[in-house]
Amino acid sequence: MSEAPRIQLLSPRLANQIAAGEVVERPASVAKELLENSLDAGARRIDVEVEQGGVKLLRVRDDGRGIPADDLPLALARHATSKIRELEDLERVMSLGFRGEALASISSVARLTMTSRTADAGEAWQVETEGRDMQPRVQPAAHPVGTSVEVRDLFFNTPARRKFLRAEKTEFDHLQEVIKRLALARFDVAFHLRHNGKTIFALHEARDELARARRVGAVCGQAFLEQALPIEVERNGLHLWGWVGLPTFSRSQPDLQYFYVNGRMVRDKLVAHAVRQAYRDVLYNGRHPTFVLFFEVDPAVVDVNVHPTKHEVRFRDSRMVHDFLYGTLHRALGEVRPDDQLAPPGATSLTEPRPTGAAAGEFGPQGEMRLAESVLESPAARVGWSGGASSSGASSGYSAYTRPEAPPSLAEAGGAYKAYFAPLPAGEAPAALPESAQDIPPLGYALAQLKGIYILAENAHGLVLVDMHAAHERITYERLKVAMASEGLRGQPLLVPESIAVSEREADCAEEHSGWFQRLGFELQRLGPETLAIRQIPALLKQAEATQLVRDVIADLLEYGTSDRIQAHLNELLGTMACHGAVRANRRLTLPEMNALLRDMEITERSGQCNHGRPTWTQLGLDELDKLFLRGR
């Protein structure tokens, strides 16, 4: 029998190389650590030079505070940092780095040269080290105030790691993405990037709102900026601002999603869940939203020391953060109207949501979301178009489409859709557009119907095409949600209660949220440490698999502190009702009926998409029409 191996300390070199496996995955990982150090040093300009995707050379130069000569060797030691001193400092840390591991890890797998000079030093000093040589060499050098870090031959001494690197272009794309993320996080810093001697981009400082918008356009593309809604909301010590893409600007991959917590780029499942909920019924299946959002909160209530790469965070009150993010984004998307989508880029802004009663995201006494968390203000509260015309329709010629003060019941909203197409009074559909663009509603006036499916309309920008079934489906769907919110959810007691075997933790969760379940029409009773009984379910969900639904909801509550599964099931049912209740294809509409539908779209939330996420209308501008006919060439 062989002798058991003895426990022994790892050599510093091996320990650093093991640590490098967590911190240094590829050149982009090196760039992230070096750039964060530059930002923490107060840099106002950062130059990045790359060769062969960052494998052969990665040089980061900044104009920050610099490092004193005596501290240069220490900067390459493990767990050496200037950013925290005590454990209490970690609870309120605002710097991007604080572990003191990055430079030691990088120097263990590459040839590293660091040159730095402080403002009060007469000369710069340089330190060199290689993976095999853990004793840094310090010598004088020429360098302006600031720091340069040069990393050559990444993974030269760990060939097993090097062979996992991708092609040069792939590695450079990852590295460039890191710089873009940091460029969005710090508008006050200039970033310059060169690859193989060629300038890739030069981003100047962005101090004012217009300059910030330009940088967002440069990083994310001008198309995003033109299809994004600026938002800024602050409440209860939580501050969210940035840009959210309209549902019409979705992507097949989640590659245009930037979320920052106190200036730190994070990818958090709680944030992803809140955003997914907010876009739930306006995105087509398989599409992903786009956003650049900045979330600012007291550092004491967020833990950034969760993962070595610091990509994950943990919030002290995750439920409140989730509900704030969801409610803010849901309201912002709900308040988009056709005139917002036709406005010039950056013209629309949500500074504070309008009061919406039992609206999405409104907080109850204990910070819980109220019952109608996915229902926004009733369209019945906004009669006529808000473009400055008379609500009576006498002067505008299109605003005579009125509604009752009280929201309709579920039965009325689902079955009386024909009443929504009551013709306008004679003479109210103008034969031609008014001369003044101020008098033209966003979706214009109907011209004709195409194949019984599409409405052709003319507005101030050109031609509008509307899918009448999809548009009316959304209108009916929103009314059904409002009706359900006003009536409440009626429960249906089960003749024979269903028993569920759960874990003790799940049973505790269900008991803790019993009031929340009851407001949604469920009645749960705990029969034992690991047994629940379902005694009542929502009447609308009597055909649903109640046992599995309750299990899924409890799993969500344990994971995120909230759940939208019940609401999603209800919305799916309402969506089916709306689909069957909407005007069908091949039904001929009169011009007044078509205009009534257009006016209704202009005051209905999320009218740009049906509840399946398909677009309901599109605009063909005069310039696009001119291109089709080669006019002006």
Curated annotation (Swiss-Prot):
Residues 336-364, 384-405 are annotated as: Disordered. One of its GO terms (cellular component) is mismatch repair complex. Coiled coil: none annotated. GO terms for biological process: mismatch repair. It comes from the Bacteria. Residues 388-401 have a biased composition (Low complexity). Pfam families: DNA_mis_repair, HATPase_c_3, MutL_C. InterPro entries: DNA_mismatch_repair_CS, DNA_mismatch_repair_MutL, DNA_mismatch_S5_2-like, HATPase_C_sf, MutL/Mlh/PMS, MutL/Mlh/Pms-like, MutL_C, MutL_C_dimsub. Gene3D superfamilies: 3.30.230.10, Histidine kinase-like ATPase, C-terminal domain (3.30.565.10), MutL, C-terminal domain, dimerisation subdomain (3.30.1540.20), MutL, C-terminal domain, regulatory subdomain (3.30.1370.100). This protein is involved in the repair of mismatches in DNA. It is required for dam-dependent methyl-directed DNA mismatch repair. May act as a 'molecular matchmaker', a protein that promotes the formation of a stable complex between two or more DNA-binding proteins in an ATP-dependent manner without itself being part of a final effector complex. This is DNA mismatch repair protein MutL. It comes from Pseudomonas paraeruginosa (strain DSM 24068 / PA7) (Pseudomonas aeruginosa (strain PA7)). The gene is mutL.
